[in-house]
């Protein structure tokens, strides 16, 4: 089950019923038709449970028993499309939900009444997500939550609605419509709380924390590997210089303290500076070890091949 389906299934388990939720679903998934009896309304979804939810909302608010039909998407074996069909009382529904425009169509923006009321705003966002929302699995890639709109003014109104709850919503035009989206994990979690998906919000947060812990561990591992590589490279340079001294003038020409550090470095090429410092007959500081190694490198540089 995808994370999007998880969120939607949690929302469908809630007993809350609000006309603003139905309004959003119709706005984003509804289409008007004309029959001999007048206007018809068809609300489409690929989720059978959402189709049943729409049916129940219509029955609850308008005592209308809609018809649920389904058909297979062309060239797709699994995806069924469910259509909730209303043939009676469509004008009354549209007027009651403030969806009708003056040209027997659907208003493309969001009613100011929704924007002014917090509970209506939350219900509208819930309906919008049920109808046309998706959220990327937090385990995979970048975080993203989207709601697709046919009309750009609706997408912008949706962004304003999200911003009302302090969410950093943005809008982008795509070939098939306009997308209102959130990209910050914190905004996505807050959105899930706003629409009432508390369990999936908690799951999202747990996955996010696990991802961050993994990333921190990887960064620490990479940093440690880089430090080891740096130590080994510096060690090999010094070892090559010690070998050069041995082949030309011999280590016995060095002072006792330089001889000791040279022999330690040859014996333990993987030792860090601190490990070298601790292994000396008389332990010294890291800066003291670095000073001796620099002297060895300088002596080697001054020798002619």
Curated annotation (Swiss-Prot):
Record GO terms (molecular function): DNA binding
Entry keywords, A to Z: Cell cycle, Cell division, DNA-binding
Family, per entry: Belongs to the WhiA family.
Function noted in UniProt: Involved in cell division and chromosome segregation.
Entry keyword Manganese: no
InterPro entries referenced in this protein's UniProt entry, alphabetically: Homing_endonucl, Sporu_reg_WhiA_N_dom, Sporulation_regulator_WhiA, Sporulation_regulator_WhiA_C, WhiA_LAGLIDADG_dom
Gene, per the UniProt record: whiA
Protein name from the UniProt record: Probable cell division protein WhiA
GO biological process, one term: regulation of sporulation
Source superkingdom: Bacteria
